[in-house]
């Protein structure tokens, strides 16, 4: 049936109305101007619209519905996919069950949706919106929105974009499956990665890039290229795998599971940590903090300013200190533990170590040689001093002696040797030799064997301790990694008579051992006859009594006590 002017209804049960319309499909309906409904049960209306497929619908101006059940409306739109829908201006619904709207949009993937201006949804089930955004072919379920952005990975999401602060186009790109790119000039390349933030000038530096799988880059011009890496802040790089983290400004976390923070720091050793400014942690599991510090040894720690911890498990702190020996510690200012001096410790200023496993107090010149004021040598136990030993109150030099009866002796008694033995007893008036006076508080105490049994090590005929070189085996963790490297060291030769099943009791804790002052100012018991400026000798009870010669009496300190000088 035709009505109007110049219309043609050639299809069975077709209906054409308006001006120059054509309804050639069965049960088709055309109306308006120059419309064509050629598909069965199709409907064309408006001006120059074409519905050429079964049950298709074209309306508006210059629209085309070219596939079954497709719907085109608006101006110059095309619905070419089965059950597709195109609306707006110059939109194209190409894929099956797709939907385009807005201006110059394209929905090519199955069940895709494109809206906005010049957006393209090529991936199946994808969605584009905004201005010139796109999802690429193969990017199923992707979503691109904003301006100029592209989502190329399956289930990826790109948003934001537009222009940088200089006005340069700066779109975002999400190419990794399940990735997310947002902000300005960002890129998410890795699987399930996330890039956010941007750049002030994309022509000079790109925005954040999340290249590693499960990585996260945020801030300005950051990069996370390692697996599960995280970069944040300004121009930071997290390139180490398995959880590296770079934050702050111009920091780099390049080792596995490393962490760099602060300003221009680098953590390159496995599980290393660098913080502060210009610090570097290159040793495995090392830590560098402060300013311009370097922790290059495994498990090393450098802190302060311009310090270096190079030895395994070494520690450098302070200013310009260097710990080159394994397990060593340098602190203070311009101190150095030299290579090979394992386990040494130095503190102070302007000095270097002399021995391994030893303690050093440096006091070198600012311009001149490096020096030590004090050294305790670990292997021998020797104490080296470049100065005076000062005792604030105690005055005598004493040595430890054992009593002949095994009983304690209180301070203030004169003592002598008991016969031909090395043991002592109280001195009497008839003794021609006086060893000294039992001291209550000596300034120096010798032969105390306070730290060990006096025969713990093998000695020669002159009582000199004998030493040997021993090999220290390497130590590995449960995964086979070397925790401590093998080495050699000098040790005293252990006496085979030593019994480790017995507990050693130091002489100072045993009643039979007493300190005898043999030189210096000593307090002595007296019978009340001694006079300052006079002399004394022991009576039969081992206490002082006035004498014509003997020990000089310096002063009376109590009714029954005087201070004498022993030499």
Residue spans for each PLM region:
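Periodic small-residue-enriched repeat registers in elongated scaffold domains
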Residues: 1-384
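Extracellular receptor-binding modules and their adjoining Ser/Thr/Gly/Asp/Asn-rich linkers
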Residues: 362-567
């Amino acid at each position: 049936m035709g009505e109007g002017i110049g219309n043609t209804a050639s299809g069975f049960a077709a209906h054409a109305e308006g001006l120059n319309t054509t309804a050639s499909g069965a049960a088709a309906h055309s109306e308006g101007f120059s419309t064509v409904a050629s598909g069965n049960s199709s409907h064309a209306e408006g001006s120059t619209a074409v519905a050429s497929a079964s049950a298709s619908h074209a309306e508006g101006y210059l629209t085309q519905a070219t596939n079954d059940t497709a719907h085109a409306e608006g101006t110059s739109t095309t619905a070419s996919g089965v059950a597709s829908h195109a609306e707006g201006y110059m939109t194209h619904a190409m894929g099956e069950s797709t939907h385009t709207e807005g201006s110059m949009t394209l929905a090519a993937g199955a069940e895709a949706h494109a809206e906005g201006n010049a957006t393209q949804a090529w991936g199946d089930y994808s969605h584009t919106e905004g201005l010139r955004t796109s999802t690429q072919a193969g990017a199923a379920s992707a979503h691109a929105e904003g301006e100029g952005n592209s989502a190329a990975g399956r289930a990826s999401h790109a948003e934001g974009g537009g222009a940088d602060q200089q006005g340069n186009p700066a779109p975002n790109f999400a190419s990794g499956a399940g990735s997310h790119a947002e902000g300005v000039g960002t890129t998410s390349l890795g699987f399930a990665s996330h890039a956010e933030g941007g750049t002030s000038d994309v022509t000079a530096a790109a925005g954040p890039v999340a290249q590693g799988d499960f990585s996260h880059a945020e801030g300005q011009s950051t990069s996370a290229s390692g697996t599960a890496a995280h970069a944040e802040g300004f121009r930071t790089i997290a390139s180490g795998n398995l959880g590296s983290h770079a934050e702050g400004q111009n920091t780099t976390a390049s080792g596995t599971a490393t962490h760099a923070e602060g300003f221009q720091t680098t953590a390159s050793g496995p599980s290393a940590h660098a913080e502060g400014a210009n610090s570097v942690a290159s040793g495995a599991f090392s830590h560098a903090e402060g300013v311009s510090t370097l922790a290059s040894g495994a498990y090393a720690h450098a802190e302060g300013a311009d310090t270096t911890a190079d030895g395994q498990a070494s520690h450098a702190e302070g200013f310009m200190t260097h710990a080159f020996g394994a397990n060593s510690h340098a602190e203070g200012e311009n101190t150095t533990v030299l290579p090979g001096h394992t386990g040494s410790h130095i503190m102070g200023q302007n000095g270097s170590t002399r021995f391994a496993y030893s303690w050093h107090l440096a006091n070198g010149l600012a311009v001149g040689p490096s020096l030590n004021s004090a050294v305790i040598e670990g292997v021998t136990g020797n104490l080296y001093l470049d100065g005076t030993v000062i005792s604030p109150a105690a005055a005598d030099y004493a040595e430890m002696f054992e009593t002949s009866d095994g009983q304690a002796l209180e301070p203030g008694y004169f003592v002598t040797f008991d016969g031909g033995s090395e043991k002592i007893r109280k001195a009497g008036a008839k003794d021609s030799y006086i060893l000294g006076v039992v001291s209550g508080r000596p300034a120096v105490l010798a032969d105390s064997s306070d730290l060990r049994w006096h025969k713990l090590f093998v000695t020669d005929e002159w009582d000199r301790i004998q030493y040997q070189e021993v090999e220290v085996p390497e130590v590995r963790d449960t995964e086979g990694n070397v925790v401590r490297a093998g080495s050699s060291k000098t040790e005293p030769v252990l006496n085979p008579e030593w019994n480790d099943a017995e507990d050693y009791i130091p002489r100072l804790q045993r009643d039979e051992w007493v300190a005898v002052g043999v030189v210096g100012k000593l307090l002595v018991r007296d019978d009340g006859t001694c006079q300052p400026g006079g002399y004394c000798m022991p009576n039969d009870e081992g206490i002082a009594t006035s004498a014509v010669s003997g020990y000089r009496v310096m002063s009376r300190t109590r009714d029954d006590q005087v201070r004498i000088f022993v030499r």
